[in-house]
Regions:
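Zn-dependent metallopeptidase/amidohydrolase metal-coordination segment
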Residues: 10-13, 18-23, 74-78, 313-362
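A short beta-alpha structural unit
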Residues: 30-32, 227-236, 248-255, 280-299, ...
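Flexible, glycine/charged-enriched surface loops at secondary-structure junctions
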Residues: 58, 111-112, 215-228, 273-284, ...
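A generic, well-ordered mixed alpha/beta core segment in the N-terminal half of proteins
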Residues: 82-144
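Midchain, well-structured core segments that form catalytic/ion-binding scaffolds
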Residues: 111, 124-127, 133-257
Length: 374
């Protein structure tokens, strides 16, 4: 008989962790390295030890728990740090679901309990750094040799599953992310005395590009998305034509070739608009994270679990970055998603019904057994 997780125990664990760094509005502040973050990691290590695991914090504050012995282990986990005013489920759900899976296996006396290890990675969010510091450190350190693979359960952080009436998602890829620093240099001038035809308006050049960005990237690949989250106009006065416009352009896509093709198309379009507006273009690649396919064997195993569960499900790519993409460079890795209510995440309003959280946790347990061979 397949071991069953305890929905009540999972809900209690989530509520207890949410109190560490909890906010009056229901959100959580556990920025990486903050006192609340450290307290949460110490709490988690204690919970792992109570469950019978050997657990502690490494040099960068990853929490790693494993059964006695030398492995190899299938690693389950995620992260417990948050963005400012974050939600209680992002990352934390995957960590505590992993703990619940181990507890269910151990309490049932199932032999798979000896083949499972748990982790909460440090600084996935990258609020003060580049992100994924913990998983990158883990993959460059000794414990990796004892890991046979990695599974991560997560809220979707987007609207697709809920909008389609689905309750489980099997992730087959994590998008690649490219960021570019863009500067359009025109000429500042008096906004009242300079006719439109004489202007070298960097603000107009920037907004022309941003206004057509959606159609441009979807013409490259329908699953591609792009964003300009902040636009700085200089000198920034209501009566001065902007002499410079600066912004960071972010592009995401699960298809590596399309992401590569986007760079030339975006730079060409910016160059065309800059020329028409009498501006100069500075286009500088900033950071790049490659798209990462999940391990086909693990994806197939999770699809079998989803099919047997009777839950409505689909295969999908992740539009957000996750520690799984770092692990996938080194060991087989895959992910499961549960719906996010109204697609909200990185927000105090982040929410998923307890029933869906429990179903996802059981799917993680079933997937663990499917991969380990029962």
């Amino acid at each position: 008989m397949t071991p069953r997780i305890s929905p009540e125990r999972l809900a209690e664990s989530l509520a207890e962790l949410a109190r560490i760094g909890g906010r009056p509005d229901g959100g959580v502040d556990r920025l990486a390295g903050s006192p609340a973050d450290v307290e949460a990691r110490q709490w988690l290590a204690a919970r792992m030890r109570e469950a019978g695991l050997e657990a502690g914090l490494d040099g960068v504050n990853n929490v790693f728990g494993h059964p006695p012995g030398a492995g190899p282990w299938l690693l389950l986990g995620s992260h417990t740090d948050t963005v400012p005013a974050g939600g209680r489920l992002d990352g934390a759900y995957g960590v505590l679901a992993a703990l619940e899976v181990y507890q269910a296996l151990a309490m049932a006396g199932h032999p798979a309990a000896a083949r499972v290890a748990l982790v909460s990675f440090h600084d996935e969010e990258g609020v003060s750094g580049h992100g994924f510091e913990g998983s990158e450190h883990f993959c460059a350190s000794a414990p990796l040799a004892s890991i046979s693979g990695y599974l991560e359960l997560h809220i979707e952080q987007g609207p697709r599953l809920e909008a389609e009436g689905l309750e489980l998602g099997v992730v087959d890829a994590i998008v690649g992310i490219d960021r570019y620093d863009v500067a359009l240099i025109g000429q500042a001038n008096h906004a009242g005395t300079t006719p439109f035809s004489y202007r070298r308006d960097a603000g107009r050049a920037a907004t022309r590009f941003i206004g057509g960005l959606r159609e441009l990237v979807q013409g490259i690949e329908p699953r591609m998305v792009a964003n300009v989250g902040a636009l700085q106009l200089e000198p920034g006065a209501p009566n001065v034509v902007p002499g410079a416009a600066r912004f960071v352009l972010e592009v995401r896509c699960p298809e590596p070739a399309a992401l590569g093709a986007a760079r030339a198309r975006l730079e060409d379009e910016l160059g065309r608009i800059a020329t028409e507006e009498g501006c100069q273009l500075e286009f500088t690649p900033q950071t790049s994270w490659p798209a990462m396919a999940m391990f086909p064997g693990y994806v197939a195993a999770l699809e079998r679990v989803a099919q047997r569960s009777g839950l409505p499900w689909r295969r999908l790519e992740s539009g957000a970055g996750h520690d799984a993409e770092i692990l996938a460079r080194h060991v087989p890795a895959a992910m499961l998603f549960v719906p996010s209510h109204e697609g909200l995440s990185h927000s105090p309003r982040e929410h998923t019904d307890d029933r869906l959280l429990a179903q996802g946790c059981q799917a993680l347990l079933d997937g663990t057994l499917e991969i380990l061979g029962g």
